[in-house]
């Protein structure tokens, strides 16, 4: 079943990106430059993104921030996000996200997640874990580069942890992302900022993070040597605030990456991040790969 899910996802993405390539044509400004996450779509446009994140760690920090070695743990997340515009004024978009995860623990190598095994007694779990209907809108008409994306994450798993192997949070999450971008007059530099908030609610016994609030600001600085290519640096911070469940943590990550416009409609990205500090958290690194198609 797990292979059918991934093959179906891969086949869907290939069909989308093939269709996008067929629509390829020259453009003055690439979608990579024009459509930052803060931009909204007009009616009939589609934004389809397939993003893959591999997090692996061999070190962690306790509540005081003291670091120590750990047995390697690996967490792979593959997400498919689909959005479309519903009016000509580009003020509201609607979308749906789905996540697939594959995790391994107890010293298994980082690439073990790509075996997509679901055997908790052998330190591995995998499966489709959540879906999230979303809405994205511009709250201030005069500031089109400031948008808010609100999503409601619905868990699809019965157990958060089995035989010590964590798969995903078993709780409902209300997520709000605040996006803003600024482009320099030279159009070679772009600054993108976001604040991501996640409120987890439900019974404390159902999820470790229920009844808590996560706040994650981030800043991305991109340099465009040309319209079809950009390199970027980023800084992100995450703070989980315990409301009634008694669990809190935080971390800071820095990273760099690149994006390239393959065709008029399709671009891909590679990003690396390193967790440089934290409290009661892992101190690992992430390797990220994404494909994005913008269709008229």
Positions of the model-derived regions?
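Bacterial Sec-dependent N-terminal signal peptides
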Residues: 1-22
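Active-site-adjacent structural elements in folded domains
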Residues: 203-205
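Transmembrane beta-barrel domains of Gram-negative outer membranes and organellar outer membranes
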Residues: 21-157, 164-200, 214-296
């Amino acid at each position: 079943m797990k292979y059918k899910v991934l093959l179906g996802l891969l086949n869907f993405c290939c069909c989308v990106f093939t269709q996008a390539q067929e629509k390829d044509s020259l453009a003055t400004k690439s979608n990579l430059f024009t459509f930052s996450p803060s931009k909204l779509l007009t009616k009939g446009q589609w934004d389809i993104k397939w993003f893959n994140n591999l997090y692996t760690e061999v070190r962690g920090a306790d509540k005081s921030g003291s670091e120590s070695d750990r047995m390697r743990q690996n967490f792979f997340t593959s997400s498919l996000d689909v959005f479309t515009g519903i009016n000509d004024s580009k003020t509201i978009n609607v979308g749906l996200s789905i996540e697939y995860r594959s995790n391994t623990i107890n010293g298994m190598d980082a690439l073990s997640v790509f075996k997509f095994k679901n055997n908790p007694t052998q330190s591995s779990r995998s499966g489709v874990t959540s879906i999230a209907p979303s809405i994205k809108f511009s709250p201030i008409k005069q500031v089109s580069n400031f948008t808010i994306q609100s999503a409601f994450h619905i868990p699809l798993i019965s157990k958060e942890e089995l035989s010590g192997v964590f798969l995903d949070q078993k709780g409902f999450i209300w997520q709000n992302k605040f996006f803003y971008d600024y482009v320099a007059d030279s159009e070679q530099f772009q600054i993108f900022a976001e604040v991501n908030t996640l409120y987890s609610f439900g019974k404390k016994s159902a999820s470790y993070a229920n009844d808590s609030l996560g706040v994650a600001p981030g800043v991305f600085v991109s340099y465009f040597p040309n319209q079809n290519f950009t390199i970027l640096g980023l800084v992100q911070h995450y703070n989980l605030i315990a409301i009634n469940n008694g669990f809190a943590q935080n971390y800071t990550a820095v990273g760099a990456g690149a994006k390239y416009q393959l065709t008029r409609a399709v671009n891909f990205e590679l990003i690396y991040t390193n967790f440089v500090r934290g409290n009661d958290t892992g101190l690992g690194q992430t390797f990220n790969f994404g494909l994005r198609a913008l269709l008229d």
